[in-house]
Amino acid sequence: TDLFSRFRLKYPAIHIRLETGDAAGAIERVQNGMADVTVAAWPNKLPVNLLFKTITTTPLVFIAPVVPSDVTSLTDRSDIPWKEVPMILAEQALSRKRANAWFAKRGIKPTIYAEVTGHEAILSMVRLGCGVGVVPKLVLDKSSLKEELRILDVKPALKPYSVGLCLHKNRLASPIVRAFWNIIEDTNND
Protein backbone atom coordinates (compact mmCIF):
# COMPACT_ATOMS: atom_id res chain seq x y z
CA THR A 1 0.00 0.00 0.00
CA ASP A 2 2.88 2.34 0.74
CA LEU A 3 4.02 1.94 -2.88
CA PHE A 4 0.63 3.01 -4.19
CA SER A 5 0.52 5.95 -1.76
CA ARG A 6 3.95 7.11 -2.88
CA PHE A 7 2.99 6.72 -6.52
CA ARG A 8 -0.26 8.69 -6.06
CA LEU A 9 1.59 11.49 -4.24
CA LYS A 10 4.19 11.79 -6.97
CA TYR A 11 1.80 11.29 -9.92
CA PRO A 12 -1.70 12.41 -8.80
CA ALA A 13 -3.04 12.73 -12.36
CA ILE A 14 -2.42 9.06 -13.19
CA HIS A 15 -5.39 6.79 -12.61
CA ILE A 16 -4.67 3.35 -11.17
CA ARG A 17 -6.86 0.39 -11.99
CA LEU A 18 -6.33 -2.18 -9.28
CA GLU A 19 -7.71 -5.70 -9.51
CA THR A 20 -7.61 -8.28 -6.79
CA GLY A 21 -7.87 -11.95 -7.43
CA ASP A 22 -6.07 -15.24 -7.48
CA ALA A 23 -2.39 -14.60 -6.85
CA ALA A 24 -1.51 -17.98 -8.36
CA GLY A 25 -2.23 -16.62 -11.85
CA ALA A 26 -0.47 -13.27 -11.36
CA ILE A 27 2.70 -14.10 -13.29
CA GLU A 28 0.70 -15.66 -16.11
CA ARG A 29 -1.40 -12.47 -16.39
CA VAL A 30 1.79 -10.42 -16.86
CA GLN A 31 3.14 -12.84 -19.46
CA ASN A 32 -0.15 -12.80 -21.38
CA GLY A 33 -0.28 -8.99 -21.38
CA MET A 34 -3.46 -8.95 -19.28
CA ALA A 35 -1.76 -6.88 -16.56
CA ASP A 36 1.06 -4.35 -16.52
CA VAL A 37 2.20 -5.11 -12.98
CA THR A 38 1.10 -7.82 -10.54
CA VAL A 39 1.76 -8.71 -6.94
CA ALA A 40 3.06 -12.26 -6.92
CA ALA A 41 5.08 -14.79 -5.01
CA TRP A 42 8.59 -15.28 -6.37
CA PRO A 43 8.34 -18.44 -8.47
CA ASN A 44 10.96 -21.15 -8.27
CA LYS A 45 12.04 -20.03 -11.74
CA LEU A 46 11.26 -16.58 -13.15
CA PRO A 47 10.79 -16.42 -16.94
CA VAL A 48 13.63 -14.43 -18.54
CA ASN A 49 11.27 -11.83 -20.05
CA LEU A 50 9.95 -10.78 -16.62
CA LEU A 51 11.29 -8.52 -13.88
CA PHE A 52 10.58 -9.03 -10.18
CA LYS A 53 11.15 -6.72 -7.20
CA THR A 54 10.76 -8.20 -3.73
CA ILE A 55 8.63 -6.17 -1.34
CA THR A 56 8.63 -8.56 1.60
CA THR A 57 9.26 -12.14 2.64
CA THR A 58 6.63 -14.11 4.51
CA PRO A 59 6.71 -17.52 6.15
CA LEU A 60 4.31 -20.18 4.94
CA VAL A 61 2.45 -21.58 7.92
CA PHE A 62 0.21 -24.51 8.71
CA ILE A 63 -3.01 -23.23 10.26
CA ALA A 64 -5.69 -25.01 12.27
CA PRO A 65 -9.03 -23.93 13.69
CA VAL A 66 -9.40 -22.67 17.23
CA VAL A 67 -12.93 -24.11 17.51
CA PRO A 68 -12.97 -27.63 19.01
CA SER A 69 -13.37 -30.21 16.25
CA ASP A 70 -12.03 -33.51 14.96
CA VAL A 71 -9.26 -31.47 13.36
CA THR A 72 -8.19 -29.87 16.65
CA SER A 73 -8.15 -33.29 18.34
CA LEU A 74 -5.58 -34.36 15.72
CA THR A 75 -3.52 -31.16 15.72
CA ASP A 76 -3.39 -30.96 19.52
CA ARG A 77 -1.34 -34.17 19.65
CA SER A 78 2.39 -33.83 20.31
CA ASP A 79 3.06 -35.90 17.17
CA ILE A 80 0.49 -34.83 14.57
CA PRO A 81 -0.72 -37.82 12.49
CA TRP A 82 -0.42 -36.01 9.16
CA LYS A 83 -1.85 -38.91 7.12
CA GLU A 84 -5.14 -38.52 9.04
CA VAL A 85 -5.34 -34.72 8.97
CA PRO A 86 -7.75 -33.36 6.35
CA MET A 87 -5.89 -30.74 4.32
CA ILE A 88 -7.30 -27.69 2.59
CA LEU A 89 -4.82 -26.55 -0.03
CA ALA A 90 -4.65 -24.11 -2.90
CA GLU A 91 -5.33 -25.69 -6.27
CA GLN A 92 -2.10 -24.46 -7.79
CA ALA A 93 -0.34 -21.68 -5.88
CA LEU A 94 3.29 -21.74 -4.80
CA SER A 95 2.03 -22.56 -1.30
CA ARG A 96 0.59 -25.80 -2.75
CA LYS A 97 3.90 -26.71 -4.36
CA ARG A 98 5.76 -26.09 -1.11
CA ALA A 99 3.21 -28.10 0.91
CA ASN A 100 3.40 -30.97 -1.59
CA ALA A 101 7.21 -30.96 -1.34
CA TRP A 102 7.04 -30.89 2.49
CA PHE A 103 4.74 -33.93 2.56
CA ALA A 104 6.69 -35.81 -0.13
CA LYS A 105 9.96 -35.35 1.74
CA ARG A 106 8.35 -37.10 4.72
CA GLY A 107 6.79 -39.86 2.62
CA ILE A 108 3.29 -38.69 3.51
CA LYS A 109 0.36 -38.74 1.10
CA PRO A 110 -1.92 -36.09 2.62
CA THR A 111 -5.67 -36.50 2.85
CA ILE A 112 -7.04 -33.68 0.71
CA TYR A 113 -10.37 -32.39 2.01
CA ALA A 114 -10.58 -29.52 -0.47
CA GLU A 115 -8.60 -27.76 -3.18
CA VAL A 116 -9.56 -24.11 -3.41
CA THR A 117 -8.69 -20.97 -5.32
CA GLY A 118 -7.22 -18.31 -3.08
CA HIS A 119 -5.85 -18.20 0.42
CA GLU A 120 -8.95 -16.48 1.83
CA ALA A 121 -10.99 -19.58 0.99
CA ILE A 122 -8.46 -21.71 2.89
CA LEU A 123 -8.79 -19.44 5.94
CA SER A 124 -12.59 -19.71 5.86
CA MET A 125 -12.69 -23.48 5.55
CA VAL A 126 -10.06 -24.02 8.25
CA ARG A 127 -11.95 -21.66 10.57
CA LEU A 128 -15.02 -23.88 10.19
CA GLY A 129 -13.04 -26.92 11.33
CA CYS A 130 -12.89 -28.61 7.92
CA GLY A 131 -9.14 -29.19 8.02
CA VAL A 132 -5.65 -27.73 8.21
CA GLY A 133 -4.41 -25.26 5.63
CA VAL A 134 -1.16 -23.75 4.40
CA VAL A 135 -1.10 -19.99 3.85
CA PRO A 136 1.40 -17.14 3.85
CA LYS A 137 1.57 -15.66 7.36
CA LEU A 138 1.07 -12.24 5.79
CA VAL A 139 -2.38 -13.34 4.57
CA LEU A 140 -3.28 -14.65 8.03
CA ASP A 141 -2.03 -11.49 9.76
CA LYS A 142 -4.22 -9.27 7.54
CA SER A 143 -7.32 -11.45 7.85
CA SER A 144 -10.35 -10.63 9.97
CA LEU A 145 -10.45 -14.37 10.78
CA LYS A 146 -7.01 -14.47 12.43
CA GLU A 147 -8.42 -14.71 15.97
CA GLU A 148 -10.29 -17.88 14.98
CA LEU A 149 -7.20 -19.61 13.59
CA ARG A 150 -3.93 -20.75 15.08
CA ILE A 151 -0.52 -21.42 13.62
CA LEU A 152 0.77 -24.94 14.15
CA ASP A 153 4.35 -25.27 15.33
CA VAL A 154 5.55 -27.59 12.57
CA LYS A 155 9.19 -28.64 12.22
CA PRO A 156 10.82 -28.25 9.84
CA ALA A 157 8.97 -25.15 8.76
CA LEU A 158 7.87 -24.69 5.19
CA LYS A 159 10.18 -22.63 3.02
CA PRO A 160 9.08 -18.97 3.16
CA TYR A 161 8.53 -17.02 0.00
CA SER A 162 9.16 -13.58 -1.31
CA VAL A 163 6.25 -11.42 -2.33
CA GLY A 164 6.88 -8.71 -4.85
CA LEU A 165 5.87 -6.91 -7.98
CA CYS A 166 6.29 -8.50 -11.37
CA LEU A 167 6.21 -6.99 -14.84
CA HIS A 168 7.11 -7.86 -18.41
CA LYS A 169 10.37 -6.17 -19.47
CA ASN A 170 8.65 -4.77 -22.59
CA ARG A 171 6.20 -2.80 -20.41
CA LEU A 172 9.05 -0.56 -19.18
CA ALA A 173 8.65 1.26 -22.51
CA SER A 174 5.41 2.71 -21.11
CA PRO A 175 6.16 5.95 -19.21
CA ILE A 176 3.49 5.16 -16.61
CA VAL A 177 4.77 1.65 -15.94
CA ARG A 178 8.35 2.96 -15.88
CA ALA A 179 7.34 5.65 -13.34
CA PHE A 180 5.73 3.01 -11.11
CA TRP A 181 8.78 0.74 -11.40
CA ASN A 182 11.02 3.67 -10.41
CA ILE A 183 8.92 4.16 -7.25
CA ILE A 184 9.52 0.49 -6.44
CA GLU A 185 13.27 0.86 -6.97
CA ASP A 186 13.34 4.03 -4.84
CA THR A 187 11.47 2.20 -2.06
CA ASN A 188 13.91 -0.72 -2.17
CA ASN A 189 16.82 1.72 -1.89
CA ASP A 190 15.38 3.47 1.20
Stretches with model-predicted labels:
Residues 27-28, 53, 78-80, 123-124, ...:
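Alpha-helical segments flanking ligand/cofactor-binding loops in enzyme cores
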Residues 14, 31-39, 60, 126-132, ...:
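Alpha-to-beta junction loops
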Residues 47-58, 72-74, 120, 124-169:
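Beta-alpha-beta core module
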Residues 24, 43, 67, 94, ...:
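Alpha-helix/helix-capping structural signal
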Residues 2, 152-190:
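A late-sequence structural motif
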Residues 13-17, 109-113, 162-164:
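Residues at or immediately flanking beta-strands
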Residues 1-45, 116:
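Central regulatory/effector-binding core of bacterial HTH transcription factors
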Residues 70-78, 84-106, 173-177, 181:
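Secondary-structure junction motif
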